[in-house]
């Protein structure tokens, strides 16, 4: 929050309300407020990608990956097994089972000596027309079975591409054969199981539960996906899931991370264990939340494979900076601001201490057709009066509201320019890293040959 100006609670042309002047943490794993907006925007991106792909004639699958787990397993160990370890100054990053899915000669094929892939050496990815995938990681925890991290991925197949890396483009679509799809699904199940077994035999899932495939047949399926991931899971939505892990209520005695946080808040606020939502003692919930914080640090909750966005003609990225961009863009989604009030820093702190911030933003909405600035100001002032802060509200003139909207758009435009430049740098860095990796692999191969037995 800007101490000099406090916040602005404004009504948009669409009748919604926004709060300008607040700092955003952008922590998708840990902040319920930021996560709700980020995941909603991510869900819109995912839906746009799936709809675009199906319109082009491609095919999409929802694939869910799980590992066997028990109450003594650490979340960090399970996340390492699924997603890979995080790079540290002392150790390189180690791939997880997810990364193993799209590596190796069986998957990628073998290149002929002239650098072109020969027809008899194509890999599974060529036969199914693999284009890329979007991965989302979800976590639940229970007192009996412990942590349960799992991955949902939208996999796009049935495409033919040309070019490499940043120049890669989709040039055609086709329907993969049933034999090719069966081969792919069997290969992924085998690779997933073997990769987890290698990390820890206890994580090895059975063939029935480790990897599950669901085909998205039509654009309606994609829209159903959007409907599901944009609202609370209530048992009536389609069995399709990806981005909105923040809204999910776990079942079978398990709880989602934000349910841990909610129970912590209820118990520290004086509610009894019987009355508070969720399970377990305060100590158990605090311990699980702290473990969750440590295990998710530095990881991406939602990630697209490299160059997939550009091949589909979509912008955006997967970093924390991109998440912050989405938060800022969400403020501008409602259109031009038409009414608003300024609230001082002390006034807004009084509102949040009484948990009235949601009521204050609702008071600024104009869905009932009430767009009069004075009326908006009066409704917000009535809410702040409950926190003894009515005198901290100042109704803004039309010119002041327009100036606030212009500042918001200017900040958004600047962030988008910075994001474009940042992604270009990241793309260049990725290509440099690829070249370094190839050199390291070649050096290791030469070293192995040099250290091998000498024939006489």
UniProtKB/Swiss-Prot annotation:
Q: Which GO terms describe its biological process?
A: plasmid partitioning
**Where is composition skewed (Basic and acidic residues) in this entry?**
416-427
Give the family from UniProt: Belongs to the Gram-positive plasmids replication protein type 1 family.
| Chain positions covered by the region annotation Disordered | 416-456
- What is the species of this protein? Streptomyces lividans
**Segments of skewed composition (Acidic residues):** 428-437
* Name of this chain's protein: Protein rep
Q: Which UniProt keywords apply?
A: Plasmid, Plasmid partition
What biological function has been recorded for the protein in this entry?
A: Essential for the autonomous replication of the plasmid pIJ101.
Q: Which domain of life is it from?
A: Bacteria
């Amino acid at each position: 929050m800007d101490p000099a100006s406090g916040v602005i609670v404004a009504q948009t042309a669409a009748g919604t309300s926004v709060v300008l002047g607040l700092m955003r943490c952008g922590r998708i794993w840990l902040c319920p407020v930021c996560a709700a907006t980020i995941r909603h925007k991510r869900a819109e991106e995912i839906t746009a990608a799936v709809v675009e792909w199906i319109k082009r004639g491609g095919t999409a699958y929802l694939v869910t990956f799980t590992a066997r787990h028990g109450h003594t397993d650490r979340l960090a160990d399970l996340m390492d097994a699924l997603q890979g370890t995080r790079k540290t100054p002392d150790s390189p990053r180690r791939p997880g089972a997810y990364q193993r899915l799209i590596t190796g000669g069986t998957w990628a094929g073998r290149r002929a000596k002239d650098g072109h892939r020969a027809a008899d050496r194509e890999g599974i990815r060529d036969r199914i027309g693999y284009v890329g995938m979007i991965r989302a990681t979800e976590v639940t925890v229970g007192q009996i079975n412990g942590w349960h991290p799992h991955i949902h991925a939208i996999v796009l197949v049935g495409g033919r591409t040309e070019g490499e890396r940043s120049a890669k483009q989709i040039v055609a679509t086709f329907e993969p054969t049933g034999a090719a799809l069966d081969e792919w699904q069997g290969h992924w199940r085998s690779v997933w199981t073997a990769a987890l077994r290698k990390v820890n035999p206890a994580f090895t899932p059975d063939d029935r539960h480790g990897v599950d495939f669901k085909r998205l047949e039509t654009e309606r399926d994609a829209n159903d996906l959007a409907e599901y991931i944009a609202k609370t899971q209530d048992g009536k939505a389609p069995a399709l899931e990806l981005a909105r892990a923040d809204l999910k209520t776990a079942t079978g005695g398990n709880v989602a991370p934000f349910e841990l946080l909610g129970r912590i808040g209820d118990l520290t606020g004086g509610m009894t264990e019987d009355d508070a939502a969720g399970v377990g003692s305060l100590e158990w919930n605090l311990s699980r939340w702290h473990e969750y914080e440590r295990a998710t640090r530095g990881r991406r909750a939602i990630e697209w494979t490299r160059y997939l966005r550009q091949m589909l003609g979509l912008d955006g990225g997967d970093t924390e900076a991109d998440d912050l961009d989405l938060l800022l863009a969400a403020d501008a989604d409602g259109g031009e601001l038409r009414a608003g009030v300024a609230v001082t820093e002390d006034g807004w702190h009084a509102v949040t201490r009484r948990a009235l911030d949601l009521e204050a933003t609702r008071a600024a909405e104009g869905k009932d057709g009430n767009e009069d600035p004075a009326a908006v100001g009066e409704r917000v002032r009535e809410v702040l009066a409950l926190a003894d802060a009515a005198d901290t509200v100042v109704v803004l003139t039309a010119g002041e509201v327009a100036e606030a909207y212009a500042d918001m758009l200017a900040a958004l435009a600047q962030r988008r320019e910075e994001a474009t430049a940042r992604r270009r740098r990241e793309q260049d860095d990725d290509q440099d890293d690829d070249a370094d990796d190839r050199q390291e692999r070649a050096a290791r191969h030469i070293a192995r040959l040099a250290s091998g037995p000498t024939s006489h």
